[in-house]
Each structure stands twice: as structure tokens, then as C-alpha cells.
Amino acid sequence: MARVTVEDCIDKVENRFELVLLAGHRARLLSSGAPLTVDRDRDKNPVVALREIADQTITPDDLKEQLIHSLQKYVEVDEPEAEAVPLLSSSPAAAAVAPQSSGDDGDIQFDRMSEEDLLRGLENLAPPTETEDEGD
């Protein structure tokens, strides 16, 4: 890599080690098809990445965020926990209301169905129709 290019980047990214990480990440992005923001001039991807950082066509902060996201194995999703807390309340009033709210099913309570009710329900089910593929 050209020493002049590295020296041009030091005032943009103060830490040389961070500069190497960011330029390497950008070079990998370029080799995978990311669009160039400067002319290539027959330079290789690491030199082009350093020139992009030196010319400030790519901000080091954006590169740093992209590098962090590319290295993450688990992406944390921010979900509001304040809404989940009232649902988990174990008050007696909430426990009494929950079993009664069965939605559109009416009086049916699946957790209290007897074996005879289950067998009666299975007998009322229509058998599946036979298709041409199954007849072979």
C-alpha cells in the first residue's frame, strides 16, 4: 500500500489499527461488488479503500458500523418490555378473566374436553378425498 495514502488517512482515523480494520473491511466490500466512490486508476481494492477514506467519500463512522454489523452473530432486537409486563401480571383478577376469554369458539374449552367428546368430534370429521396421485 502506498505510504502517502496511509498518511493521508491518519488525520481521518487516528488509530492505525482501526484504519487497517476499516480499510480491509471496505476492500472486502469492494471485492464483493460494492460501488466505487473514487476512480480506480488501476489500483487494487485496499488502495482504493484507503483513497476513499482519505478523500472522505466514505465516512469512517459508517465503515465502523458496517464492520460491527458484519461481525455480529446475534443481532439484538429492541423490543419494548413495558408492554409485556402488564400481560405477565399474576393477579387473581387477571387469572379469572383469562380462561373465560375463548374468542370466537363459544363455550368450547379444549383443556377440559373429555375423551368421549374428542372421539365424537373425530367421528364427525370428513375423510380426505382421494386424489389421482394416491390411486396409483
From Swiss-Prot:
Residues 81-136 are annotated as: Disordered. Keywords: DNA-directed RNA polymerase, Nucleotidyltransferase, Transcription, Transferase. It comes from the Bacteria. One of its GO terms (cellular component) is DNA-directed RNA polymerase complex. Residues 83-99 have a biased composition (Low complexity). Promotes RNA polymerase assembly. Latches the N- and C-terminal regions of the beta' subunit thereby facilitating its interaction with the beta and alpha subunits. One of its GO terms (molecular function) is DNA-directed RNA polymerase activity. It is an enzyme of class 2 (transferase). It catalyses: RNA(n) + a ribonucleoside 5'-triphosphate = RNA(n+1) + diphosphate. The gene is rpoZ. PANTHER family: DNA-DIRECTED RNA POLYMERASE SUBUNIT OMEGA. Its EC number is 2.7.7.6. Residues 109-120 have a biased composition (Basic and acidic residues). It comes from Methylobacterium nodulans (strain LMG 21967 / CNCM I-2342 / ORS 2060). GO terms for biological process: DNA-templated transcription. Belongs to the RNA polymerase subunit omega family. The lineage of its organism: Bacteria, Pseudomonadati, Pseudomonadota, Alphaproteobacteria, Hyphomicrobiales. This is DNA-directed RNA polymerase subunit omega. The RNAP catalytic core consists of 2 alpha, 1 beta, 1 beta' and 1 omega subunit. When a sigma factor is associated with the core the holoenzyme is formed, which can initiate transcription. Pfam families: RNA_pol_Rpb6.
